[in-house]
Amino acid sequence: MKEKYPLRVEEWKKKIEKYERHRGRKPSFPALLVVDVQKFFFSPDSHAYIPSLSLVLPNINKLLQGFRKKNLPVVFTYYAWKEGEDKGSMGRWWKDAVMEGEERAKPLVAPHRGEKILRKPHYSAFYKTDLEEYLKDKGVKDVVICGVMTHLCCETTARDAFMRGFDVYFVMDATATFNEELHLSSLLTLSHGFAVMVETEEVIRWLS
């Protein structure tokens, strides 16, 4: 099921062409959402290890540099549960819960001072968090999504952002999951109904 797949962006663009609703749009005032870039998904001995995360990390860092230069909002999320917290359907589905304070909950990329760090125990970064309020208080109209996993937390966060009135930009070569099939399936569905598909360098050009 797992593979280290190359970032075949040009091929992906051709495949989503017949489904995507928008291309070439630019955000007005975006925030960068860095979803779950943490040790749980990067350690080869973890059952949640994502082999292609190492390929997209440089692009995630490029996006961070670009947003920081423009003093635009950056939000980091990480997946973890607190002791005694009701795990609900997530606990029944996945069994193995990452707990707050564990080594595998720690980030791979260090947030800068003033950047929001958001713990989330569910797929969506908006579910039972203050993310929507935080973004709207800052006047954010658009969210740019990078991180892992493409087909779970990134996709669910993208859909949820759309439903809450944000324009969504999904960075194809700065998101990753277990294999290319799952990654591409998310790009196809999101491009049709929820998000504008973009590349890292395209976002950097907006910001320059």
Place the predicted regions along the sequence by residue:
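Active-site acidic carboxylates
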Residues: M1-R113, S208
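Glycine-centered short loops/turns at secondary-structure junctions
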Residues: K69-L72, G139, G165
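Internal catalytic-core helix/loop-beta-alpha segment
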Residues: E100-V148
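A short glycine-rich beta-strand->turn/loop micro-motif centered on a GG-aromatic cluster
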Residues: V144-G147, D167-E180
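Short glycine/serine/threonine-rich phosphate/pyrophosphate-binding segments
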Residues: H151-T157
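Active-site-proximal loop->helix
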Residues: N179-S191
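A charged, well-structured terminal subsegment
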Residues: V196-S208
